[in-house]
A protein has these predicted regions:
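The feature marks the mature, well-folded catalytic cores of soluble enzymes
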Residues: 1-127
Length: 127
């Protein structure tokens, strides 16, 4: 793997639009109740509904907190009618379900060249 500190834009790379063709959608399973104070109970079911709609058309790569959680998550997904053959599970420690803050950021250039950004999210400022 090559590593560079050069500006990706100057090298001809760009971040693809969300509507462009892609291999999969990455999501992270919600598990931090503090993100939804007093409202967490329906959140896993809401995520399952989102996954159901996406997995009907493409692969979902789902980050989960542990293999122990996988059994419960699969039950929720099954009960929601998710096409499980299109869901791939990846165990990784996370502190939030907002994968855009810490997940892989793919960029692309002409002629099919692809790269990953080493993006370091350092949390939200106070708002």
């Amino acid at each position: 793997m090559d590593y560079t500190t050069d500006n990706p834009h100057k090298l001809g790379y760009r971040m693809p639009a969300e509507w462009e063709n892609h291999a999969a959608t990455w999501l992270s399973w919600p598990h931090q109740k503090e993100d939804w104070p007093g409202k967490f109970q329906p959140i896993p079911w809401v995520y399952a509904e989102i996954i159901r709609h996406i997995a009907a058309h493409e692969v979902v790569k789902l980050v989960i907190p542990s293999n122990e959680h996988k059994v419960k998550i699969r039950k929720i997904l099954q009960a929601s009618g998710v096409l499980l053959k299109n869901v791939q599970f990846f165990v990784a420690r996370t502190n939030r379900s907002w994968i855009r803050d810490y997940g892989p950021i793919y960029i692309t250039a002409e002629k099919g060249h692809k790269a990953l950004l080493d993006f370091r999210f350092n949390a939200w400022a106070k708002y």
